[in-house]
Each structure stands twice: as C-alpha cells, then as structure tokens.
C-alpha cells in the first residue's frame, strides 16, 4: 500500500524542471523548426509562419530582447487577444517554442528509460504491424476482452493540474493555462473533434503533447502494475510520448479502489492479462471469468472518476467474448475462430475418437467500413461502384496514375496481414476503375474508348508492385500464387494507419 501511494503521489525528483527560462534561449527556437530532429512531430515550415530562413534568426533575437522587458508579457497577452485568428507572429513563435519546451521532461524520461534497459534497436517496436503477431500468440488462449475508449471530454484545467506533476515553475504553468484558454474557451472541454479543430490552424504539436500527457495519466495504473508484477526484459515500455503502442504481461494484478472515504488495495490473480493501445482505443484481454472482467470494467471507471477526475461513462467500455465477437482494432477485424477436429487413437484392440478444437487468430479487411472511407474520399459511391475524381487541368496522366498507385500500394501493404485477400482485391478494383474513369473524364472520353486507345498495361504496373516485392522476398514455387493468397505478411516500417484505413 505504501509503494502504491508513493507512486501515485507527486514525484519530487520529476518536479525539478524549470522550463520558463528556456524561452529566452535562441537555440530553442532553432530546434522548433529543425526538420531533421529525430522523433519530431511538428513539420510546419517556417515559410508558412510568415518569415523565411534568412530573417528568422534576426526575428527571434529581436523577440528575445523584447521578452526581457518588464511589461512584455502584458503586451503579449493583449496582442494575442486582439488577434483572434492567431495571426500575430510573436504569439505563433512563442507557442511553437513552448510546445518544444514542455516536451523536455517526457523526452528525458524516454532517453533514461532506453539507457537503463540498454536497448540498442527499438525502432521495430514502433511499427504498429508488430502488435498483430503478439495478438496472434496471446489472444488464442484468452476468453474475454475489454474494448476501452480513452475518457473524453476533459476540462482544460485538469490538463494543467496533470502537468503539475512534471513542471514545477509557476510561469510555465501560467503560460500553459493562457494558451489553453485562449485557443479554446475558458469554460470548455477538450474532445477529439474540438481539439483538432482549434489546434489544426495553430500548433498541432502542442495538442499532441497534451493528448499524450492525458493518455499517460490514464495508463499510469498499468505502468505501476507492470513495474510491480512483470519482468519482461525483451519488451520496452518507455514514455508514452514517443510510443505508438504499449503492452505488458501481468501475473498478479493490483487495482486501486478510490472513493470519497478510503482507498483499499485488492489483489486479483490473473496470469493471462494483456493490454494494448493505439491512439484513443485500447483493449484489455484476459482469461478470467465474466464476473472478473466485469469487475475490471467498473474498477477502471471508478478509478478514472475518483482519482483522476475523468468522467467516463460505463458505455465506453464494452465486454466481448473472443469466440463470439470480432474485435475492431487498428483497421482490422480480428477474431478467434475455433476449428473442430477429430483424431482417432488406437490402443491394442480399442480405438478412441478424440475431439480437438484448434483456435486460430484471424485478421480480415473490414470491407464495409473501407468502402465507406473510399466513398467519403469520392473514389466510389455508397454502394461501392467506382466513380471519377475531378482532376486538375495541369495534372499529367502520370501524376494521376502515381497518386492512385500510392494509395493502392499503401493499402495493400497495410492489409497484407489479412487472412482473406478477396476483400482487398475488391478495393484494388475500385481504385483501378476510379483511376481509369478519372483519366477518361480528363480526356473527355469513355472508359472503354480510353482503354482501347492507350491499353490497360499502364494501370497494371502500380497494382502489381506489391506482388513483385513479395516475389523478391519469397522464392518462386508452383504454388506461389496460392501462397501469396494465404500468407500473412507484417511490415516493420509502418508507424501509422493510412487515412482511408482509419475508419474507427
């Protein structure tokens, strides 16, 4: 109990980060617009901010000189409020630099975590495809899964209180509160759509930092459980700022029950508990009974509401049985299929029939959701019939084909792990015919006339590139086509879901 209380309390060693003086350092502004930084999230060019590379250094120096003035902060606040569209150059520069500065405590934690664990190569762990082999190995032995949505909405002031665990100096917290309340509303809540709306025109990196700190707070319970009960040396669970996902194996689970009167510590033994998260959705799979997994559901809701003050409706956590429901996660429909088999065993003069069931993890393409995404992008209608997209008059045929080809290849790579490729072939057909109709519309002709004139060979190159890559990896055999149709292929260089595949 004492260890848990010490973990949940403010860590004094992490508070000694005085970040406000860094606003007066010129190299911070250089780091803000350095596109070569490893792990950088912000890619906005400085030309879009209204100043070029030659004059940016001079502008920053003049800004730092004005910041040393006694009444600069008052003038800065007044200028910011007068420019509601955030067009003031000083405000934009300071907000960009502040987003980099507040990431420093989390970045230091990530570096120290990697150095302590002596992990030389951890880039492959960032591939979101690497989580599916883990699910294939673990979910086939489990019974229930909790589909969890990260609690939203959250009040702006709660974000400031959360960051007090990491930032000690009061000026940084006041500046953080100022940016939050001026970007949105002083009495508003942050929700996914609203946050993107008022941060998309400003500093999107700032929003990503706030989101990661919010998720970090929600998952602090799982971090504590893994540190106390799990010792997997081959798995890194560093800071969530640079992590795409986080999972851990827990043998003995500890849960904190928070209420208005007391805090009780209860122990649940479950050697098969696994946690996976991507963006705002996470899953908690277990081999426990339905009663135990239902207790976990209400424990999480009570923990978020009583300790972290996150209002989370019970409907945002669903309990599904793996054998009866498909798991919609990371753009795939995953399920555990049970295949019955009968084995005849003979001993002396007696023979026996043994019924065995083989559990197999399957991932398929959610064809209906993917067609809806293609329809929103104007590649087809709601029924899946390909339509032409309006093409610019100055776009060449090769540019149009290349644009369609990149979309097709990206979708083929991401859904290469599907156990059923027939749905993927339908998506390729929609993109192929939509490309042909777009070119025919540009040349003011019909698809049939256009294909007769130019032939269909120019559309086949980018649709068959993925198969050519696979032929270089795997040797050709008489059954190679059947093998490509059945094999699951996971790539270790995919760090994000394609926009068309992200239909959750």
From Swiss-Prot:
Listed Pfam families? Intron_maturas2, MatK_N
Q: Could you tell me the superkingdom of the organism this chain comes from?
A: Eukaryota
Cytoplasm: is it a keyword of this entry? Answer: no
The record, for InterPro entries, names: Domain_X, Maturase_MatK, Maturase_MatK_N
- GO MF annotations, alphabetized: RNA binding
Q: Which GO terms describe its biological process?
A: mRNA processing; RNA splicing; tRNA processing
**What is its subcellular localisation?**
Plastid, Chloroplast
Keywords on record: Chloroplast, mRNA processing, Plastid, RNA-binding, tRNA processing
Looking at the UniProt record for this protein, which Gene Ontology cellular component terms does it annotate, in alphabetical order? chloroplast
Q: Does the keyword Plastid apply?
A: yes
The family assignment reads: Belongs to the intron maturase 2 family. MatK subfamily.
What is the role of this chain? Usually encoded in the trnK tRNA gene intron. Probably assists in splicing its own and other chloroplast group II introns.
Protein name according to UniProt: Maturase K
Organism encoding this protein: Lactoris fernandeziana
């Amino acid at each position: 109990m004492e260890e848990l209380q010490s973990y949940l309390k403010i860590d004094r060693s992490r508070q000694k980060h005085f970040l406000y003086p860094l606003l007066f350092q010129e190299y911070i502004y250089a780091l803000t617009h350095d596109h070569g930084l490893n792990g950088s999230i912000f890619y906005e060019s400085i030309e879009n901010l209204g100043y070029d590379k030659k004059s940016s250094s001079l502008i920053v120096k003049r800004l730092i000189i004005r910041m040393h003035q006694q009444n600069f902060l008052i003038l800065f606040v007044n200028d910011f409020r007068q420019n509601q569209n955030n067009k003031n150059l000083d405000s934009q520069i300071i907000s960009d630099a502040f987003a980099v500065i507040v990431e420093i405590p989390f970045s230091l934690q990530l570096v120290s975590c990697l150095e302590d664990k002596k992990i030389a190569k951890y880039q492959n762990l960032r591939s979101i495809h690497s989580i599916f082999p883990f699910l294939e190995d673990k979910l086939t032995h489990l019974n229930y899964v909790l589909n969890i949505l990260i609690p939203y909405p959250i009040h702006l002031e709660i974000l400031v209180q959360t960051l007090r665990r990491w930032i000690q100096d009061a000026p940084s917290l006041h500046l953080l509160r100022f940016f939050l309340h001026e970007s949105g509303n002083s009495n508003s809540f942050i929700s996914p759509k609203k946050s993107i709306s008022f941060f998309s025109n400003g500093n999107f990196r700032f929003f990503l930092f706030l989101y990661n700190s919010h998720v970090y707070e929600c998952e602090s319970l799982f971090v504590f459980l893994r540190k106390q009960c799990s010792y997997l040396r081959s798995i890194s669970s560093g800071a969530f700022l640079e992590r795409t996902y986080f999972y851990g194996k827990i043998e003995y689970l500890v849960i904190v029950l928070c209420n208005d009167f007391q805090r009780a510590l209860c122990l649940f033994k479950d050697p098969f508990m696994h946690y996976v998260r991507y963006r705002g959705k996470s899953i908690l799979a277990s081999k426990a009974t339905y009663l135990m997994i239902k207790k976990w559901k209400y424990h999480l809701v009570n923990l978020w509401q009583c300790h972290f003050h996150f209002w989370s409706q019970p409907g945002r956590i669903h309990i599904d049985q793996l054998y009866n429901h498909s798991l919609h996660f990371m753009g795939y429909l995953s399920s555990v299929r049970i295949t019955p088999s009968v084995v005849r065993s003979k001993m002396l003069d007696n023979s026996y029939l043994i019924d065995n069931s083989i559990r197999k993890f399957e991932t398929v393409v959610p064809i209906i959701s993917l067609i809806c995404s293609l329809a929103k992008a104007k590649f087809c209608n709601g029924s899946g019939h390909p339509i032409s997209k309006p093409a610019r008059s100055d776009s060449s045929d090769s540019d149009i084909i290349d644009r369609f080809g990149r979309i097709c290849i990206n979708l083929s790579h991401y859904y290469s792990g599907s156990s059923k490729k027939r749905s993927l072939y339908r998506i390729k057909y929609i993109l192929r015919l939509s490309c042909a109709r777009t070119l025919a519309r540009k040349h003011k002709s019909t698809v049939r006339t256009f294909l007769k004139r130019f032939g269909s060979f120019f559309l086949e190159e980018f649709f068959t590139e993925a198969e050519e890559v696979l032929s270089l990896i795997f040797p050709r055999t008489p059954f190679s086509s059947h093998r490509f149709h059945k094999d699951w292929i996971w790539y270790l260089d995919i760090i994000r879901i394609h926009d068309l595949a992200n239909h959750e």
